[in-house]
A protein has these predicted regions:
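Acidic, low-complexity central loop/insert segments
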Residues: 15-18, 24-25, 70-212
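Anionic-ligand-binding alpha/beta catalytic cores of soluble enzymes and soluble regulatory domains
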Residues: 172-264
């Protein structure tokens, strides 16, 4: 049974998520750090100035998503923050990068995960609440230094469906003393009518906003464009990188056969829903897509989710079913009620 969580304070004020596991953070150092990443990421990194924050993917040669990452450019290094949270996942990420780190490349990799505690602020008041933490001399950039150590990533819009996520700021606080700083931040969030979000609450907020995530939506089965992230995460003007040819061909010569859409449960559950789950056309039971995320949303009035749905079935209002008789309906993203 899914737990219903009311995320309205996060959508109207702010939500604070204190990570139970620190998000992986890797630094790339050395004179060739930008050119090294330029040949791996689908995002343009070369020539970016310090303070720049970008989002991109590390792709397979067939342009399928292997890893996502926020990329923060600092004066002395480039920070990579993939959506990974365990030592094993970090080791796999580093192993992938090292495959392309040739002998003469003047670049080194280092884990910075253990030095920090991570947290996230979401909602329209996220920036106002985070500002007291910023170094007053820090530039107005996507990557901000914090006055007592650490830094913040101010995410731009996440995806074509949600160009303004209402504010999403990732914080990295030095592990020593992080507890007191986070407690002070939590007090400010609550005093302004916001809320603290646990892992389930942040997942509900994410799905309501229509934000695709690793591994549910972003994995080796999909291209960036299918998730609606090519505008945010892909540069079509840069030079060669792993997976470039299929990405470019899809953009200029092809068309999507499936894309990410919102899903609403139509009626009560007939059976328990496990993920991922095949979705069928309600009129003839042919394969129509795959349900990837499902949450119980107070804001949206019931269970909502995300799904990759095939062309011909992805229009809003399209009825779909699963193999157990549960009925769903395609919905526009984001899934929040229209004002």
């Amino acid at each position: 049974m899914m737990t219903s969580i009311d995320t309205r304070p996060s959508h109207t004020r702010a939500g604070l998520h204190m990570a139970t596991r620190t998000r992986v953070l890797v630094s790339v150092n050395g004179d060739d750090r930008a050119s090294f990443l330029q040949g791996l990421l689908c995002q343009d990194i070369a020539g970016q100035t310090p303070g720049t924050l970008r989002y991109g993917f590390f792709l397979s040669p067939k342009a399928r998503i292997l890893f996502d990452s926020w990329i923060g450019v600092l004066p002395d290094r480039i920070l990579l923050s993939p959506s990974l949270f365990s030592k094993e996942e970090e080791e796999a990420f580093l192993a992938h990068l090292k495959k392309y780190l040739f002998f003469r490349t003047k670049a080194t990799l280092a884990s910075e995960t253990g030095a920090f505690i991570s947290a996230s602020l979401v909602g329209p008041e996220a920036l106002a609440l985070a500002t007291p933490l910023f170094d007053p001399e820090a530039e107005d950039e996507g990557v901000r230094r914090l006055s007592e150590g650490g830094f913040a990533f101010l995410r731009p819009g996440i995806g074509a469906f949600d160009t303004d996520a209402g504010g999403w700021i990732d914080l990295w606080l030095p592990a020593e003393g992080a507890g007191d700083r986070l407690k002070g931040l939590e007090d400010r969030v609550l005093s302004r009518g916001g809320q603290r979000l646990d892992d389930t609450g942040l997942e509900v907020y994410r799905v309501e906003r229509g934000i695709p995530a690793v591994p549910s939506e972003l994995n080796e089965s999909h291209f960036p464009a299918e998730a609606g992230l090519d505008t945010l995460a892909v540069s079509y003007n840069k030079g060669c990188y792993v997976g470039q040819e299929p990405v470019t061909r899809l953009k200029f010569q092809g068309q999507l056969s499936r894309k990410l859409v919102g899903i609403r449960l139509d009626g009560p559950f007939v059976s328990e829903v496990t993920l991922p789950r095949h979705l069928l056309a309600s009129n003839d039971n042919t394969e129509a897509g795959t349900l990837t995320s499902l949450v119980s949303s107070v804001v949206c009035g019931g269970p909502v989710g995300l799904a990759y749905v095939k062309r011909g079935h992805w229009d809003s209002g399209e009825p779909l079913i699963d193999g157990e008789g549960n009925r769903f309906e395609v919905s526009e993203l984001p899934l929040l009620p229209r004002e």
